[in-house]
Amino acid sequence: MSHTPATRAELITLVRQWHQDSTPWIPSGQGTRLDWGPALDPDHAVLSCQHLNQVIDHAVDDLTITVEAGLPLVDLQRLLAAQGQWLPVDWPRGGEPTTTDRSDDESQSQAGTIGGLIARGLSGGLRQRHLGIRDQIIGIGLLRSDGTAAKAGGRVVKNVAGYDLMRLLCGSWGSLALITEVTLRVQPIRPAHAG
């Protein structure tokens, strides 16, 4: 069964209740990659964060953005492009939906959320030039399995205090904590030139 809380408060309440009831659950964004990895146990609840998809802060001049983890990557890129910026990451090939009855935007929005991208530690071909998603993360908000919220990192690029939990959570598949928000380093879109 899938649960999709509409607010962070609902999310915390639900996770705390599941912790008290010893209900097993698995985190999910849009659910596009639930078939990756081991088969889901029918007794496990699926916790979708797709409604937690807001921009929390966009410091255009500082080239950073903080978003909730349920924001689709395509929506993030569209929002950044309006400011002449982009996040230099892409999904690896083979994860896109195969149906042809969708427009490119709809197909890409089904490719996944920023939280799913980080939880899976996925990177496409852009990592060869711009590094992977783990190198773009400068801060992260998380929710432990007991419902305790925590944050690591910050909202500035030059942040070196504390443990590097961002790298630890990147690629953990949600097994260590549920990613609720993330602060990312973005780059300006370079002007195209002929030649």
Label each region the model flagged.
Residues 35-41:
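Short glycine-biased active-site loop of nucleotidyltransferases that positions the nucleotide triphosphate
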Residues 1-25, 49-106, 117, 121-155, ...:
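N-terminal glycine-rich flavin-associated loop
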